[in-house]
Amino acid sequence: MLIFAAVVLLAIFLRAWHFHDWLFLKMDQARDALLIKQTLENGLGWLPLLGPKAGGTHLNLGPAFYYFQYIAAFLFQSAHPAVLAYPDLLFSILSIPLFFLYLQKYFSRDWSMVLAGLYALCFLGIEYSRFAWNPNSLVFFNLLYFYAFLNIFDESIKYKLRWIIIAGLSFAVSTQLHFLSFATLPVITVVFFLFSRKEIKKNLGWKKILLFLGMIILVYLPVAVNEIITYGKNTDAFFAAIKSKPSHHSLWQNILRDFRYWGQNWFLVITSWISKKASLKPAIIAWFGMIIPGLLLAAKFYRAEKNSFKKKFLLLAILWFLAYFLIYIPISYQIRPRFFLPLLALPFLFIGFIAKYFWEKNRNIWKIPVVAVLAIILVGNLYGTYLWFKEIKSAQKKGVYPQRTIILKARDGIVLWHFEKAAEYIKRDCDKPLVYTSASSEYKSPVKYVLSLANMNAVSIENFDVGKDGCFYAFGLTRSKNFSLKNKEKFDILSQSKFGALTVYKLNPKEGESPFSKGEKEGKSSRIFWKDVHF
């Protein structure tokens, strides 16, 4: 137990170390921060009824993610980007003891500690705990739902109403954090009920089912209010998203790609290995060394298990895998590492099935490879995390080409530290009322937001007004030795200041030039807020 406690403390350290400085702040995070800052300053009425958009669609998710961010902002009385990432950090940390409790439903205490310890130090779990994004807490809420759901069928638990309430709340929150959980969790639940239909009357009467549904409706109340006000606009977007999500590839191509990406990402979760080339080897190793053996053993244990509750644990593990694998087939060409956040604990569960099988064989010789494999998983993830931290630290000194920052498309090493150093420089350098800035679309909003936190009035350089005095700065990647700006020829570069991977160029319009004829139009939000609701 002491070793497990030490592992958990190490996992917390790896999630929280340099949390402020090394926080990822991109376009989505700045957009969300601006919304929460507005709510913190103006009151609860400015909380939105819907959450962020589901990637690549016009569908808005539920607002749970924003409400968690607002709670953090209210408690700390700050809309600083690090504060808004605290909920994701907290839920990532809490998922460790939760996974331990979940594992104890089937495994011994010792095996539960081993597997939860390996999960705690998973590189991908650490990386996604260190910034704010709506999918990041999926692993916690999926686990919480499965744990509460199993407790409803656990004969040793007397007070089941609380677990029905928790199951309903966690189901609702998880389905609001990512579109795919909205599709998979209902499927898993319904199929589980079909296999357990004989025990439903015993453990779930109609009153308990209504309580479960009532908790879901409660969390979805803002979404329902929005649909009433907008006459079902988001529902229309939901059906449009279902039609648009599938790719234009054939079914066979999608299945092959699904197998490949599942294998590659499974291998990534277990080992932290990131191949520089698009190799099939990690996928092959994952499928034949981990996924297929784990799935077959889960089925074998299910057939042999006499304890009805443990059978349910194994059934849920199998359904967890099958539901996500099958639902990912139509979108297999769009799969990214973040799609594995709802399943982040599952590879370690499968490792547990394999390790348990060999460990319980009569010959002790099998225990040696089991220990060796578990050690490789542990060391691999720790080393992968070390290399990632090394990349971020290097980006504070020079332009870099990161390999391990697999969070978003932009792999440039830019973190909050770069923006804050740039803001400090601009505040010292500029003595004028306005700061005109230019940056790529990925960093336009983050730059403005961080400058606003430093009490500077930042506007797009494209909104330059000849009659208003201001300072001009363009932001670019140090490695590219360039910056994003239309009509560059109409500006003189006065100086440039490097902050590791980020370079800030001080500009000045050439005399007699009018750089822009039209300003940058601010996008008008179509969001509905609680202040807009009139009963």
PLM feature spans:
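Transmembrane-helix motifs of polytopic, lipid-linked glycan transferases
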Residues: 9, 86-107, 144, 148, ...
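Extracytosolic helix-loop segments that constitute the early lumenal/periplasmic catalytic or substrate-binding loops
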Residues: 14-18, 30-60, 64-67, 71-75, ...
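Transmembrane-lumen/periplasm boundary regions of multi-pass, lipid-linked membrane glycan transferases
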Residues: 33-45, 67-68, 173, 182-304, ...
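Short acidic/glycine- and proline-prone juxtamembrane loop motifs at membrane-interface regions
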Residues: 85, 124-135
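Hydrophobic/aromatic-rich transmembrane helices and adjacent perimembrane loops
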Residues: 89, 128-129, 138, 183, ...
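Membrane-interface transmembrane helices that cradle and orient dolichyl/undecaprenyl
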Residues: 105-110, 145-164, 174
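Membrane-interface alpha helices of multi-pass inner-membrane proteins
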Residues: 163-178, 190, 217-218, 325
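Membrane-proximal, lumen/periplasm-facing interface regions of secretory-pathway glyco-
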Residues: 367-429, 438-454, 534
